[in-house]
Amino acid sequence: MGVQCVDCVREQAKGERRPVTVLGGRAGADKPYLTMAIIAICVLVWLGEQVSPRVFQEVAFAPALGPSEPWRLLTSAFAHSPNQIMHIGFNMFALWIVGGYLEQMMGWARYLAIYLVTALAGSVTWLLFQPVDPSDPGAYTPIVGASGAVFGLFAAVIVLNRHLGRDSSGMLAIIGINAVLGFIIPNVAWQAHLGGLVAGALVALALTVARSRRSPVIAWAGILGVLALVVVLAVGKYALSPTGLLPLG
């Protein structure tokens, strides 16, 4: 037992190293609170869709809406089909399994970054295969779902586990099965899965390089680099459309 002044404790804390994860990120809480928060948001949005169709209409992404409402590229990743409970059920189960694992491994900041970047990459990759001309009815086909981000996390697990000498055979099997199902089950945006996978692998690769060289700057440079590439692809898609690039914003 003893008494310490507040200033003494503060000065002592300055000299202590903050705990970090195995990948050099800032360690978070013992429980995957960020993963739980993302799941809660998705569930609340889905419940809102049950109450009013307007919720789906306000957050879903359609190619023709991208130039005027670009935030839909990201908000659509927090919504799911209101008529298919298995859609949100599978995505949230997968997110809980891999999300909690990665959150503890990467730290909450890097984990949030990879989730958002891969979610955006999934939407943009799907966009690349769609018509964007407002005069084309297909340009108003909506997309929702967190699967782009989930597949991005799948890829990150494989890359990071390989770097750390851990087994990922089970994850490879899951990706293979879902890749086949994407071509068998109708209305599955396999393009979003592909975009998320590639983006997740690239970001995870940057994290492994950052760990090897003990340079957090490399990790964030990699994350921002993938984000920049995704944005360029989206802008390029609209710029090369028959109607030209519409103002983003």
Regions found by a protein language model. Give the residues of each.
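Membrane-embedded alpha-helical segments of multi-pass transporters/permeases
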Residues: 124-128, 165, 201, 205
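Residue-level signature of the transmembrane alpha-helical core
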Residues: 43, 88, 116-120, 149, ...
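Alpha-helical transmembrane segments
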Residues: 133-134, 147-166
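Alpha-helical transmembrane bundle and helix-membrane interface signal
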Residues: 104-105, 157-172, 208-221
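N-terminal TM1-TM2 helical hairpin plus the immediately adjacent luminal interfacial "cap"
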Residues: 31-144, 183-191
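C-terminal transmembrane module of polytopic alpha-helical membrane proteins
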Residues: 1-27, 183-249
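Central hydrophobic cores of alpha-helical transmembrane segments
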Residues: 115-118, 170-179, 221-227
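Membrane-interface loop-to-helix entry segments
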Residues: 139-155, 190-198
